[in-house]
Amino acid sequence: MAGNPKKKSTGIVNAAIGALAVVLAILIVWMMNLVSGIQGTARIINYAGLVRGKTQRIVKLEISGQPQDGMIADIDAFIDGLRFGSDELSLVRLNDDAFQRKMQELDDYFQALKQEISRVHAVGSNNTDIIPISETFFSICDDATGLAEAYSQRKATSLSALEKYI
């Protein structure tokens, strides 16, 4: 006795629908993961820019004899948040080796800049390298911001490609 061909084709269709549903579910989870990764990158780019701009303001004010210990502490917190993530600042940690290496360089250079600011307090700005050090720091900040933008663009491109399949 042969099996009912109608039942057999219905079973194949049901199996195909089930397989497609599983594939779709996997793609949706993948897309949600990409969206989650993109959501925090705008704040990272913004804070990298804040580090750059606020540091230049600190240098200008310090040179004019107005100590900025509070803003220096802010920059330390921003750099720490950019490197490791921060719930307080709502910053995610970018899982990007180039960005993380640049943030380590930025942190190290900010420590040198703070030492030079201390020298400004002691001997005056004309007797220090505060301007060239702050210019190098500005350049490192530009690089870090560019790396964060590139990371964000890669994530957005991946999401766009995935959306085409869904």
Locations of the language-model features?
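Short, charged/polar, low-complexity loop and linker segments
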Residues: 26-37, 91, 115-121, 153
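An N-terminus-focused feature that recognizes amino-terminal "leader" regions
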Residues: 12-17, 29, 41-44, 48, ...
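Short, aromatic-rich amphipathic segments at membrane interfaces
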Residues: 143-161
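Short, intrinsically disordered, charge-balanced linker/junction segments flanking boundaries
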Residues: 137, 157-166
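Short, Lys/Arg-rich, polar N-terminal cytosolic tail immediately upstream
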Residues: 1-7
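Juxtamembrane membrane-water interface segments immediately C-terminal to a transmembrane helix
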Residues: 34-76, 128, 159-162
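Extreme N-terminal signal-anchor transmembrane helix of membrane signaling/transducer proteins, especially
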Residues: 7-34, 164-166
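Heptad-repeat alpha-helical coiled-coil/4-helix-bundle sensor or tether segments in soluble regions
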Residues: 72-136, 140-147
